[in-house]
Amino acid sequence: MQTDIEIAQSVEIKPITKIATTAGLQANEIEPYGYDKAKINLDPSIVRKQELGKLILVTSINPTPAGEGKSTVTVGLADALNLADKKTMIALREPSLGPVMGLKGGATGGGFAQVVPMADINLHFTGDFHALTSAHDTLAALLDNSIHQGNPLNIDPRRILWKRVVDINDRELRHVTVGLGGPTSGVPREDGFDITVASELMAILTLSTDLMDMKERIKRIVVGYTYSKEPVTVADLGVAGALTVLLKDAIKPNLVQTLAHTPAIIHGGPFANIAQGTNSILATKTALKLADYVVTEAGFGADLGGEKFLDVKVPLLGKTPDTIVIVATVRALKHHGGVALSNLNNEDVTALRNGLENLGQHLTAMNRYGVPVLVAINRFTSDTEAELQVIKDYVQQFGATAYTTEVWAKGGAGAQELAAAVIKKSAQEADFTPLYQADDSAIDKLNTIVQTIYGGTGVELSTKAQKQLQDFKKYGWDKLPIIMAKTQYSFTDDAKKLGAPKDFKIYIREFVPKLGAGFLVALTGSIMTMPGLPKHPAALDIDIDENGTITGLF
């Protein structure tokens, strides 16, 4: 059996100029990065239609550590819609190098449902993440320099919020000490590193509507507090212009293609467990103005990326999804039903039935928004007909229909039934209802998310988190949207509690204000903003030969 990268290398890629033409872009509206990649210029003339296209949101159940093929289904569905003569584009996130070299691998789909050039996209791509890392760490250096150069802003080194970042999973960097070496080396203080995708600049990039909006958002970033506990912003430091210059190209969406030559815009890459988990506003809106159907995804499960897409991105995008597709796998549902990861290839209808509660809670949560919901079963070779039928029967009680997809093996041809259902559902009038109101308090928003999306009873705040909310109210931050930083494997804040637990509370240990992005991050349980590497990192299997042929990427 061919690997993902072998399949990607075996298919002829069209010149990116031809893909741009297919998408409806003129030659002067793109900046080619070689033969097969391009940046799309931020030009209002790109508007081709008065009405936006249909928006299809692909999300999933709580995944296993290997993922459930959400990106694969997203790509396969878009290819299937094009096979049905619907002008379709994809809007995806950029992969982070950390997971590519770590456990999960890349984020370009799989099999015959991939975006290409697969290796480039999963590695350095067009340099967006490098630009973000440079801008973020430039701000960190400028902040420390201000303290070293007489500290005119009276910044308290003990209350600095702005860590450094690197796009690698490196647990050794979570807690570091900087400024050692005497007076010429700065002011000693405790610091740490986050992974680049956790940077507020990444969130800002994906939520900005244009270059100047990004600049204004950067000004609002809170980097720390003074000795009198007043917030210090980038505007106070006076460096928003320099940071925006570093990101002037990164804000431009990237154009690539699928193996079936469907145009794909890949831009931005915040994780959904520690940030909002969506691609950029600019990428999605550009696709909506060019295509009749746009298939996009949100990171991890519907409890994380799905909820954040609907409650954080949609108000800024100005467009609600026309259909939501929840990706499920027999393997993951059996895992939620108690089967060990090593035994998931064996038929176990009883465990599958037990695990279906996880899918049921996701269906209940997504139905709450008033958008038509479908289920896509991403089929594996070990799945039996009996197991597939159990899922199809179960979802009917939630008003949904489940469709088996085989896009890994067949590409768009493996999702034609799903595509037909998406076309039919998207023709209906959706009655979108937000989960909470903008002026709800932070605690009300938190409780609503836990009760409605997770199926729990509410939240429990640490003493620190309670004090922070009091301070936020004083600063006028207490009604910002909420980003829950939570494990992706469970509805709870404990990764080991699978299925659909009841009667639980989510423990909020602290908040991180992200004024530039425009939300509050609630850190739950033991969630980390700098991941670590597994015992067997994917990097151990990646290699390159004398001809430059890469192996081991997935």
From Swiss-Prot:
Its EC number is 6.3.4.3. The gene is fhs. This is Formate--tetrahydrofolate ligase. Gene3D superfamilies: Domain 2, N(10)-formyltetrahydrofolate synthetase (3.30.1510.10), Formyltetrahydrofolate synthetase, domain 3 (3.10.410.10), P-loop containing nucleotide triphosphate hydrolases (3.40.50.300). It comes from Leuconostoc mesenteroides subsp. mesenteroides (strain ATCC 8293 / DSM 20343 / BCRC 11652 / CCM 1803 / JCM 6124 / NCDO 523 / NBRC 100496 / NCIMB 8023 / NCTC 12954 / NRRL B-1118 / 37Y). One of its GO terms (biological process) is tetrahydrofolate interconversion. The keyword Lipid biosynthesis does not apply. GO terms for molecular function: ATP binding; formate-tetrahydrofolate ligase activity. It catalyses: (6S)-5,6,7,8-tetrahydrofolate + formate + ATP = (6R)-10-formyltetrahydrofolate + ADP + phosphate. Belongs to the formate--tetrahydrofolate ligase family. NCBIfam families: PRK13505.1. Transmembrane segments: none annotated. Pathway: One-carbon metabolism; tetrahydrofolate interconversion. It comes from the Bacteria. It is an enzyme of class 6 (ligase). InterPro entries: Formate_THF_ligase, Formate_THF_ligase_CS, P-loop_NTPase. The keyword Ligase applies. Keywords: ATP-binding, Ligase, Nucleotide-binding, One-carbon metabolism. ATP binds at residues 64-71.
